[in-house]
Amino acid sequence: MRRNVSDHAEKKDKVGVEVLLELPKTLSKSNKKWQLALIKLYCSRTLLNCAKHAIRKPGLFPRSLSYTAIDLDHHHGDDHFKIDTETLNDLVKNKNQEKLESLGGPNGLVSALKSNTRLGINEEGDEIQRRRSTFGSNTYTRQPSKGLFHFVVEAFKDLTILILLGCATLSLGFGIKEHGLKEGWYDGGSIFVAVFLVVAVSAVSNFRQNRQFDKLSKVSSNIKIDVVRNGRRQEISIFDIVVGDIVCLNIGDQVPADGVFVEGHLLHVDESSMTGESDHVEVSLTGNTFLFSGTKIADGFGKMAVTSVGMNTAWGQMMSHISRDTNEQTPLQSRLDKLTSSIGKVGLLVAFLVLLVLLIRYFTGTTKDESGNREYNGKTTKSDEIVNAVVKMVAAAVTIIVVAIPEGLPLAVTLTLAYSMKRMMKDNAMVRKLSACETMGSATVICTDKTGTLTLNQMKVTDFWFGLESGKASSVSQRVVELFHQGVAMNTTGSVFKAKAGTEYEFSGSPTEKAILSWAVEELEMGMEKVIEEHDVVHVEGFNSEKKRSGVLMKKKGVNTENNVVHWKGAAEKILAMCSTFCDGSGVVREMKEDDKIQFEKIIQSMAAKSLRCIAFAYSEDNEDNKKLKEEKLSLLGIIGIKDPCRPGVKKAVEDCQFAGVNIKMITGDNIFTARAIAVECGILTPEDEMNSEAVLEGEKFRNYTQEERLEKVERIKVMARSSPFDKLLMVKCLKELGHVVAVTGDGTNDAPALKEADIGLSMGIQGTEVAKESSDIVILDDNFASVATVLKWGRCVYNNIQKFIQFQLTVNVAALVINFVAAVSAGDVPLTAVQLLWVNLIMDTLGALALATEKPTNDLMKKKPIGRVAPLITNIMWRNLLAQAFYQISVLLVLQFRGRSIFNVTEKVKNTLIFNTFVLCQVFNEFNARSLEKKNVFKGLHKNRLFIGIIVVTVVLQVVMVEFLKRFADTERLNLGQWGVCIAIAAASWPIGWLVKSVPVPERHFFSYLKWKKRS
């Protein structure tokens, strides 16, 4: 039956071809070309169909040792890789070990992905793009950021805004009913316009800051990953990872995608971000081989083959349902919220009293209209007029609340933080937590690492000793050189790459590893690939920051376990303590006598005194095939000295911090002699400190002190050598207990506890692990201590800018409240209308905040003492300045309120316009005074802040428009040049007053102590 069907299909195809071949004879020339194309297409399909039927016929092809059957009906895009996306996704998500084995294990999977465990992906052509198209990119779909409309809605949730809108609606309705649409819409419409303007400015400002924080969030998630491509180890963005990539993993790294383990030693993974379990999971070729995106490497090192990226990973699917929280509230914002609430309560009380007084005066008939007639005449007054009058009073009272509540304070903090974060990125500091910006300004102690932070991290081997002799490799026996080759090539996490003959070598790994590899290749003529190919690794003990060493148990390929060799590498004095013999230059193993040991110690000390990092190599034959590496009775191969020069400018940065009252402490893993030499070179240790025996000590000694001894000595310690991450944590805790605000730098995974414990954690962007970065508040992108000093300056600038704005806004709040209250009680009316007060509110909250929040840091900030943990937010200096200016403004404006008409011989409306205009101009001139809390010269550096100048110009222009051209909207009257001159003169008087007031000394004891720094939780 099957044969008949097949024959029938063949006959049918044959007939179809014959018919098509006859068709061109009956067609016109214009259609023949199209018909021929159709024939070609039909023939192609027919031939393929015939081939398919032929292949299916049993017995047609005799079985051979190797044959391939092609199913043309089931072609997929990822057949090029011999495995489909669904299979790959299922592999890791479900830890499908059975499926992995069916693919031939990790090596078979890598082959199916057209990759290589040693060489990685071949990048030639469009291979990377093909993988991205087939398997997807390593990016996550996140919840969309908040749009502008969201912030508009948030602004309208403000109760005072809603009350004002209600008042505006009633005022609009009664105005139109009483005066008609043409004349009656002004009062209510003006309030509507003013409210919508305030809402629009607030929403746009918050929207822009949110976008800014989103951008910074994206930058912080763009981490660098080590991969192998074309046999070359290189660093790429996590977003550029593709399926098939061979990723190199070390302690502290984040796993960038889902994948399988292909090689490595003692790899332990922290999967708590995925499973919630705190226990580390071991990953190996014989057990669990699966690695999840988003997890962290807790110990060991290795390589993984990427199987799924982006949204195909379990982490990606989880992240797609999580929205970024950009509403993080800093400690300062919390304090300002409390301040705003306290002032708001005062404003509410004043507004209630004003409303009460206005209502009493209205209903007792003491208020009069513009014609001099009583506004309320008992039963003869229409109900509409009464309601309209009451609505105006309520609007005035509510507007007083709007002005009284310093809502601009949180906005000022947001603006300052957003501006500072953007500028700090240019200064090589990426802020991860907003609170760090302001807290850094209070820092009293900075605990810094040495390597890469104070030094260039450009290491080079400058000294080497073979036995007790210093010399060149050419004078050393071949046996010693071979042992060095083994000890360097097999006991490293770095790699060597050379693309083709004639090109330079490329070294990867930590700076120390690269220096050692470079020395071994160039001086000892080590062929790393050859050494690796000739030997097998039996067991590895990775570098330990406590023991300061790493080791490997290895053997030659094809040789029994009796020829195992242990190689150790690490801190010279630590390795020396493990040795009982040493190799001399000729390769003879000699017993290490006490005199020899003393001589080696002197060699180490002499190199350390030259600021060299001393690394020793030792070995021993080990016939036992066990996992515990031999740690005693080793033979010392040699000692090398690695030079890591101080960074240019680091001494100046240290001096700047010390001049600013910030104590610098260096915490390093180097020996005490190297640490002392570097500290002197960097300016951390002064000649006086060198005479102090307590200024420099080792971590073990500090660790062994009692808690009372540590607290008593910690402030005098300048350098801690041979320290562990636990020692750093101990020091941070002690300093915090003494009341210090502590900043700590760190780059390793083990630094995470100290970074979290510190008030400000500063991780290194180049050498720092992902664990360290995630535990920190700020990432120093260039690993430079000078950038740490810059962060300190920016921290002080943030705090200083916010204090400037607080002083400026509270001056306005006090003046506006007093003027309206006194006028309402005495005259039964408020000189500043709802629209005018909303305009003042706009000037203060947005334009004023923008002008004062974007001041750049000055060197004067580094001449002050640290703010500390208990400093009040509003200082005595600020109280002096704001009360003096507020008193002046209140005095002048009350004179205008009660004597303005007689002094200037003007109408009531012109008098009120004079009050409004003078009040606004006073704030403009007072913004200059607010630029400096202490300095008399408020114009210094003004030309550098174009934004400030621009805002002042815009404010003045808009004020002129409000007074001269929007008189119906703003309820003002036009002023002549003389009246403008009077307003400007009164406002300008705030400059000399500010100059004089700053000459008045203030007591050191604070007027108020309820606004204090609290410890960061």
Curated annotation (Swiss-Prot):
Record entry for activity regulation: Activated by calmodulin.
Location(s) in or outside the cell: Membrane
InterPro entries registered for this protein in UniProt: ATPase_P-typ_cation-transptr_C, ATPase_P-typ_cation-transptr_N, ATPase_P-typ_cyto_dom_N, ATPase_P-typ_P_site, ATPase_P-typ_TM_dom_sf, ATPase_P-typ_transduc_dom_A_sf, HAD-like_sf, HAD_sf
Binding residue positions for Mg(2+): 747, 751
N-acetylmethionine found at: 1
CC terms in the record's Gene Ontology section: membrane
Pfam name, any one: Cation_ATPase_N
Stretches in topological domain Lumenal: 169-186, 357-393, 822-832, 897-905, 967-976
Catalytic reaction list: Ca(2+)(in) + ATP + H2O = Ca(2+)(out) + ADP + phosphate + H(+)
Region (Interaction with calmodulin): 20-31
Protein EC: 7.2.2.10
Alphabetically ordered keywords of this record: Acetylation, ATP-binding, Calcium, Calcium transport, Calmodulin-binding, Ion transport, Magnesium, Membrane, Metal-binding, Nucleotide-binding, Translocase, Transmembrane, Transmembrane helix, Transport
Broadest EC class assigned to this enzyme: translocase
Annotated TM spans: 148-168, 187-207, 337-356, 394-411, 803-821, 833-853, 874-896, 906-926, 945-966, 977-998
Gene Ontology molecular function: any one: metal ion binding
Entry annotation: catalytic residues: 449
Sequence ranges on the Cytoplasmic membrane side: 1-147, 208-336, 412-802, 854-873, 927-944, 999-1002
Highest taxon of the lineage: Eukaryota
Membrane topology: Multi-pass membrane protein
Free-text note regarding domains: The N-terminus contains an autoinhibitory calmodulin-binding domain, which binds calmodulin in a calcium-dependent fashion.
Protein role: This magnesium-dependent enzyme catalyzes the hydrolysis of ATP coupled with the translocation of calcium from the cytosol out of the cell or into organelles.
Family, similarity comment: Belongs to the cation transport ATPase (P-type) (TC 3.A.3) family. Type IIB subfamily.
Protein name: Putative calcium-transporting ATPase 13, plasma membrane-type
Primary gene name: ACA13
